[in-house]
């Protein structure tokens, strides 16, 4: 008996498989087209340099917050010492007056003003001042002195509390700026980690060459012929500071560092001047107001401070022949570079 079942259609299975394969290929092609291309070495370097510049800005804000915290801490310590000494003096005055009162009591003649003064907690004395003023006691001078001490002590305590509040705010700001710096540096490191090992090695070699060139250059010898007059120091103080800076060529940039083995930009200049027994402010923005401003590059002399960018977040020394000596940024070392590598704003002669 002949079978009436329909014959198998192998072609249908094949078509289904081919269709699925084609769909998958289209999907993969679409995903590839939509995926963002991996940034190349040069693009990553540009982004990293930008992040390093932003980190340096945040570093100067951190330095300012740290300086403010240090100043406020000293003020708080001083006020707390004054309060402690004032309390001791007040206690001594009270004890002396108490001794007089005891002697009068034993002799049967306690002065009414002392009786009123000693009748309750001495801290409530100010509320009774008007009554004491009317007594005209022979002890009024002692009581007035205690009253004056109490008022002074209350004022000192108020000032100390105000400074403690300011100190807490400064510590909060310091923490915020520290997180800002670390965040920028971490972001830069993530970008560097996205490169291939070969690309990272190439960037490292570029930085090594820049460091090597900047640590072996001599601005006074870079120009053939007649030496630049600007290589003569601006003053003996500037000469001593600049010489101290030269002695640290090759030391690494570390944000927030003030030497002697690592520096940020303003830490480098402030440390160098300190070696010349000249105290200048800690931050680049404050250093910009530490001396006479010079707006023309042609008027700069060796040892002058030079400032860059609109917000003045970078500072270094003028070295002569269009070169500066500075601590540039993360990954770099104290070195010479062209003054034209950054937007120059003005110099300052200390």
What does each model-identified segment do?
Residues 16-18, 106-109, 136, 157, ...:
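Short hydrophobic/aromatic segments of transmembrane alpha-helices and their interfaces
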Residues 1-42, 166-247:
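Hydrophobic packing segments in regular secondary structure
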Residues 38-52:
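Short N-terminal segments immediately surrounding and downstream of signal-peptide cleavage
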Residues 44, 139-142, 146, 261, ...:
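Short, conserved glycine- and acidic-residue-centered signature motifs
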Residues 50, 57, 78, 92, ...:
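Extracytoplasmic/secreted proteins, especially bacterial periplasmic and envelope-associated proteins
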Residues 104, 190, 279-281:
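Secretory-pathway/luminal and periplasmic proteins that interact with or process carbohydrate-rich
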Residues 225-350:
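Peptidoglycan cell-wall recognition and remodeling modules
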């Amino acid at each position: 008996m002949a079978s009436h079942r329909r014959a198998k259609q192998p072609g249908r299975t094949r078509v289904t498989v081919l269709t699925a394969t084609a769909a998958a290929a289209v999907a993969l092609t679409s995903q590839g087209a939509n995926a963002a291309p991996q940034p190349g070495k040069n693009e990553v370097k540009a982004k990293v340099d930008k992040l390093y510049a932003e980190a340096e800005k945040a570093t100067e804000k951190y330095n300012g917050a740290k300086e403010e915290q240090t100043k406020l801490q000293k003020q708080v310590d001083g006020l707390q010492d004054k309060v402690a000494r004032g309390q001791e003096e007040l206690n001594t005055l009270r004890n002396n007056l108490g001794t007089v009162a005891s002697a009068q009591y034993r002799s049967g003649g306690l002065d009414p003003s002392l009786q009123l003064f000693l009748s309750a907690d001495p801290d409530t004395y100010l509320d009774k001042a008007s009554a004491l003023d009317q007594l005209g006691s022979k002890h009024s001078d002692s009581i007035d002195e205690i009253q004056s001490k109490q008022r002074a002590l209350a004022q000192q305590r108020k000032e100390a509390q105000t400074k403690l509040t300011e100190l807490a705010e400064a510590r909060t700001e310091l923490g915020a700026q520290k997180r800002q710096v670390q965040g920028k540096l971490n972001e830069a490191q993530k970008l560097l980690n996205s490169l291939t090992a070969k690309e990272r090695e190439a960037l490292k070699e570029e930085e090594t060459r820049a460091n090597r060139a900047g640590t072996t250059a001599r601005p006074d010898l870079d120009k053939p012929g007649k030496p630049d007059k600007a290589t003569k120091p601006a003053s003996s103080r500037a000469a001593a500071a600049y010489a101290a800076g030269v002695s640290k060529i090759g030391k690494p940039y570390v944000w927030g560092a003030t030497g002697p083995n690592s520096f940020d930009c303003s830490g480098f200049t402030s440390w160098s001047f300190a070696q010349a027994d000249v105290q200048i402010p800690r931050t680049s923005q404050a250093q910009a107001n530490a001396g006479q401003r010079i707006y023309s590059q042609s008027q700069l002399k060796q040892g002058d401070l030079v400032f860059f960018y609109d917000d003045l977040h970078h500072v270094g020394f003028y070295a002569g022949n269009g070169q500066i000596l500075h601590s540039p940024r993360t990954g770099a070392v104290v070195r010479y570079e062209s003054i034209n590598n950054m937007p120059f704003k003005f110099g300052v002669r200390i």
